[in-house]
């Protein structure tokens, strides 16, 4: 069994989250900052919540992760990327280590349209 399939077999937990795809860079920035502000974690993109591999467009998903870090996180969050193949499908692993630059904040907008920063 490949390494990525072993990770998927673990299921989602405190330090691992499955994402079918990234639709909102600001939303994923919150997950990334949560990992960086605590013990670190891993995103597996192209994996459904039930653990089934659906695959992803690696370049699109990388762009969304990069945008999340650079546009919405202060300070920006460092991450490592690994692309895994499961048959003909690609799974993008995004590893976020516990940060030495904590706390990280995520830019948001409150109900009144005012910019706010969440840790």
Across the structure, where does each feature detected by a protein language model lie?
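Conserved N-terminal catalytic/coupling substructures associated with nucleotide/phosphate chemistry
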Residues: 1-119
């Amino acid at each position: 069994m490949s390494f990525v399939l072993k990770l998927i077999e673990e299921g989602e937990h405190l330090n691992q989250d499955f994402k079918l795809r990234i639709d909102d860079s600001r939303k994923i920035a919150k997950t990334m900052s949560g990992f960086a502000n605590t013990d670190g974690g891993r995103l597996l993109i192209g994996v459904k919540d039930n653990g089934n591999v659906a695959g992803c467009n690696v370049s699109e998903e990388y762009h969304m992760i990069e945008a999340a870090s650079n546009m919405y996180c202060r300070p920006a969050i460092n991450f490592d990327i690994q692309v895994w193949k499961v048959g003909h499908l690609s799974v993008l692993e995004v590893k976020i280590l516990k940060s030495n630059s904590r706390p990280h904040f995520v830019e948001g907008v409150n109900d009144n349209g005012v910019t706010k920063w969440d840790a």
